[in-house]
Amino acid sequence: MTRSLKKGPNVADHLLKKIENLNSQGEKRVIVTWSRGSTIVPAMIGHTIAVYNGREHLPIFVTDLMVGHKLGEFSPTRTFRGHAKSDKKSRR
């Protein structure tokens, strides 16, 4: 079930304040955040947001196609190292 339209998007207050301050000053800086559940709103377009994935902050440049998605969708938390290779020498 999707979020009700009357509630509006879920964006962390501290993150929205930082974005609005940078927009009013006309600056573009990397914004560091741990808020993976925040929804990307049109005010964030053009900013680079470093989202925490549990180990490091991954910089994400926000484009207009990302609006409506969550920040956590663009910083994967798991590293896939490939499936186990079949070792034919140990089978003999």
UniProtKB/Swiss-Prot annotation:
SUPFAM superfamilies: Ribosomal protein S19. One of its GO terms (molecular function) is structural constituent of ribosome. GO terms for cellular component: chloroplast; mitochondrial small ribosomal subunit. It holds the Pfam family Ribosomal_S19. PROSITE patterns: RIBOSOMAL_S19. Keywords: Chloroplast, Plastid, Ribonucleoprotein, Ribosomal protein, RNA-binding, rRNA-binding. InterPro entries: Ribosomal_uS19, Ribosomal_uS19_bac-type, Ribosomal_uS19_CS, Ribosomal_uS19_SF. GO terms for biological process: ribosomal small subunit assembly; translation. The keyword rRNA-binding applies. Protein S19 forms a complex with S13 that binds strongly to the 16S ribosomal RNA. Belongs to the universal ribosomal protein uS19 family. NCBIfam families: rpsS_bact. This is Small ribosomal subunit protein uS19c. It comes from Spirogyra maxima. The gene is rps19.
